[in-house]
C-alpha cells in the first residue's frame, strides 16, 4: 500500500485521494486555501468519502477524514469481489466495475482504486470513462457501490427464491 494510508484506533483504513490548492483573488492579492478528498473504510464493506477545506493542508485533510467517517455506507460484497458488473456516472465521469476471479487483484486507476481498497474489494476489473476528475470518479464509484444489492435481498423484495432470479 502507498504512504497515503493510515490505520486508526477504530480499525478504519484512511486514504488521501487528492489535495488541491485553490486561490481566491481579492483586492490585496490572492488568498490560497487547500481542499482535500479522502476515503475511509474498514476493509469489510463499510466505506465513506469526505472533502475538507482549510488554509493549511493538515487541517483540510483532518476535516475530510471526519467528513468521510460521517458519510459511511455499507456495501454488499460477494466475498472479496462485487456481486455483479455495473455502470455508474456522476457528472461527466462514468465508471464500469465488474467482479473478477480470485487472484486477479484490483485493476482500477487512481481514485477508484482507493475507494475499492478501503471498501475491502480485493478482486475487481474497473475502468473510468469520460472525465477523470477524482471528485467525480469517487462520487460515481460510490453511486455504483451503494446501488449494488445482494441476490438474497433482490429475491426477498420480489418474493422469489435466489435460484429463480439467478
Curated annotation (Swiss-Prot):
Belongs to the universal ribosomal protein uS5 family. Keywords: Ribonucleoprotein, Ribosomal protein, RNA-binding, rRNA-binding. GO terms for molecular function: rRNA binding; structural constituent of ribosome. The N-terminal domain interacts with the head of the 30S subunit; the C-terminal domain interacts with the body and contacts protein S4. The interaction surface between S4 and S5 is involved in control of translational fidelity. This is Small ribosomal subunit protein uS5. The lineage of its organism: Bacteria, Pseudomonadati, Pseudomonadota, Gammaproteobacteria, Pseudomonadales. Part of the 30S ribosomal subunit. Contacts proteins S4 and S8. PROSITE patterns: RIBOSOMAL_S5, S5_DSRBD. Pfam families: Ribosomal_S5 (PF00333), Ribosomal_S5_C (PF03719). SUPFAM superfamilies: dsRNA-binding domain-like, Ribosomal protein S5 domain 2-like. With S4 and S12 plays an important role in translational accuracy. Residues 12-75 form the S5 DRBM domain. One of its GO terms (biological process) is translation. InterPro entries: Ribosomal_Su5_D2-typ_SF, Ribosomal_uS5, Ribosomal_uS5_bac-type, Ribosomal_uS5_C, Ribosomal_uS5_N, Ribosomal_uS5_N_CS, Ribsml_uS5_D2-typ_fold_subgr. It comes from the Bacteria. It comes from Pseudomonas fluorescens (strain ATCC BAA-477 / NRRL B-23932 / Pf-5). GO terms for cellular component: small ribosomal subunit.
